[in-house]
């Protein structure tokens, strides 16, 4: 029970991390971001969750998809895993990075940019994510 979560919640979180980021060190940072957000009552904001909801339950693949799996609009974890996960994703949940990050964005260059404040996050989005963060962009799973 890392960070006081159940094994089922750890698996759910690992499944989100699996779909969000491929790099082990970034997975650990994203796990830390997610734990911090859960502790502070901030939605996870994981794009992989609304993409999953759209693929499985229908609806547009946008951040406004009205699904209980969409962590852009709902707090906490979704009701269950959104994919299979690797040992590295589960390792990230068990051993998250020790940082103060609260935000991250995957840039158009597929690099993850981590920040601590919303202002820094918005600046990173504006600088590194002009295509894939644009309104109307349809992400592919």
Name each model-derived stretch.
Residues 1-141:
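Bacterial extracytoplasmic/cell-wall-associated proteins, especially those involved in peptidoglycan
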């Amino acid at each position: 029970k890392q960070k006081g979560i159940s094994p089922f919640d750890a698996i759910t979180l690992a499944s989100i991390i699996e779909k969000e980021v491929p790099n082990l060190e970034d997975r650990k940072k994203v796990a830390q971001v997610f734990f911090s957000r859960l502790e502070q009552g901030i939605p996870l904001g994981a794009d992989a969750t609304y993409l999953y909801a759209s693929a499985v339950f229908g609806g547009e693949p946008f951040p406004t998809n009205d699904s209980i799996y969409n962590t852009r609009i709902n707090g906490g974890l979704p009701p269950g895993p959104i994919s299979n996960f690797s040992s590295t994703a589960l390792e990230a949940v068990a051993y998250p990075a020790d940082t103060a990050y609260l935000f991250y964005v995957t840039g158009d260059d597929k690099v993850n940019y981590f920040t601590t404040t919303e202002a820094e996050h918005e600046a990173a989005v504006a600088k590194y994510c002009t295509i894939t963060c644009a309104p109307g962009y349809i992400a592919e799973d």
